[in-house]
């Protein structure tokens, strides 16, 4: 069975927001970000423990890990290994207040 990745709705909104922000200055870079995120999700699905553990207080986020979007070091993927792949929880800019962002409603 091919490893898979599930992108939750909040992470999809993150990607949409990043795309729209970058597109204002560089439509090509915005498309590259989405392609790089997809490629990185696939890589992480194949090797789910590649990313570093990210400590969290919330039990529902236990096992959270982080990894940069390939070629976009300021964009960080927060994900959890799941059976057969990964669940992408958030995709945040490195300057964000991560604990606050993780507490935002879905």
Identify the meaning behind each predicted range:
Residues 10, 39, 97:
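Residue-level recognition of oxygen-bearing side chains
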Residues 31-32, 52-56, 100:
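Short, hydrophobic secondary-structure boundary micro-motifs
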